[in-house]
């Protein structure tokens, strides 16, 4: 099984040393714990790239079974059609909700933390596989790793 995993890129303007260290440590932890999910695209691979063109090109070139994406990468991946996706905290615009195929409706899963409630509401209006975590304001791929494994391995997820 070939999957592509796009982690959250570093996007803090004028970060403090603590913010930089926190990001790096979290990314290393997620990479180590979630390596079995697929080929990882961490900040080193994403840095300086135009995500809006880079991510779709990687998907076209590599033909993955699943795309797993976090944050801004999830927002970009949401716009890719005819591709199985697991998305964590994408920013959902009304443009993303237009012309959605039945394949995309059935094969796109979205997970949202408390800070992305409005995105969750928009997403679940079109996509039936949506989950909101109201008690969590910093949902990570590691937090939902077991659920993601169930999805990409074809097991039923309630």
Model-inferred region functions:
Residues 67-78:
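Gly/Ala-rich beta-loop-alpha elbow adjacent to hydrolase catalytic centers
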Residues 65-68, 84-86:
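Residue in the alpha/beta-hydrolase core beta-strand immediately N-terminal to the catalytic nucleophile
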Residues 1-34, 40:
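Short, surface-exposed "cap/lid" segments of acyl-processing enzymes
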Residues 6, 37, 47, 56, ...:
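Catalytic phosphate/metal-binding cores of nucleic-acid and nucleotide-processing enzymes, i.e., regions
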Residues 92-143:
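The feature captures the conserved acid-bearing segment of alpha/beta-hydrolase catalytic domains
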Residues 41-61:
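Alpha/beta-hydrolase active-site loop
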Residues 82-95:
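A conserved short beta-strand
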Residues 139-158:
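Catalytic active-site module of serine/aspartate enzymes centered on a nucleophile-bearing elbow/loop
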């Amino acid at each position: 099984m070939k999957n592509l995993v796009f982690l959250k890129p570093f996007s803090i303007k004028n970060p403090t040393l603590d913010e930089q260290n926190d990001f790096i440590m979290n990314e290393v932890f997620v990479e180590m714990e979630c390596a079995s999910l697929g080929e990882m695209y961490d900040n080193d691979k994403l840095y300086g790239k135009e995500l809006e063109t880079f991510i779709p090109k990687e998907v076209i070139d590599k033909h993955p079974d699943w795309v797993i994406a976090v944050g801004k990468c999830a927002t970009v991946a949401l716009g890719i059609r005819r591709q199985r996706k697991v998305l964590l905290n994408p920013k959902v615009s009304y443009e993303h909700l237009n012309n959605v195929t039945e394949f995309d409706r059935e094969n796109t899963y979205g997970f949202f933390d408390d800070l992305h409630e409005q995105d969750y509401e928009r997403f679940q209006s079109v996509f039936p596989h949506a989950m909101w975590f109201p008690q969590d304001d910093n949902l990570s791929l590691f937090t939902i790793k077991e659920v993601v494994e169930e999805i990409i391995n074809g097991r039923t997820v309630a």
